[in-house]
C-alpha cells in the first residue's frame, strides 16, 4: 500500500493493492484471479477501484505501483504496468476488453504491456503508453517460463533536479 493526497485537500488517502488468495510467485505456475488497486479516504470511505484484469498476473513481483504528485497540481497520480482488459476507476477499459493472453500454465508471456498514469481523485486512466523495455523473447531473459522477465521494480527520481520522473524497471 501507499499514502498520498489524492484529492488535493491536504490530507492523505490510502492506496491498496488487493491480491487474490491464489496469487503465485512467478516461479510457480497456475492461474490467478485479478489484482485490484483501491483508494480510500482515511475514514474508510471508498474512492475508486482499478481492476488490472486477466493479463496482469497476481503475485509479489508483478505489480509495483507508484503514487506521487507528478504534475505538481496538489493531487497525486498513480502509475503502474497495465495490459489489455485493465478497467480504470471510471469503468473504462484499456486495450482489448476480451483479450486473454494467459498460457496453459497461467503465465502471461505474450500480448501488449502498457504503462498507465491514473488520476488520483477518480482512478481514471489519463495516459497509456507501451511499457519499456518490452518483454520480447522471454527465453532471452534467462529462462522460458517468465521468472526473470516478469520481475518489476518502480520508483520516483528527480532526474533533472526539478521535476519528478517515474522509474520503472523489468
Model-predicted segments: where are they?
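Beta-propeller-forming repeat regions
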Residues: 1-170
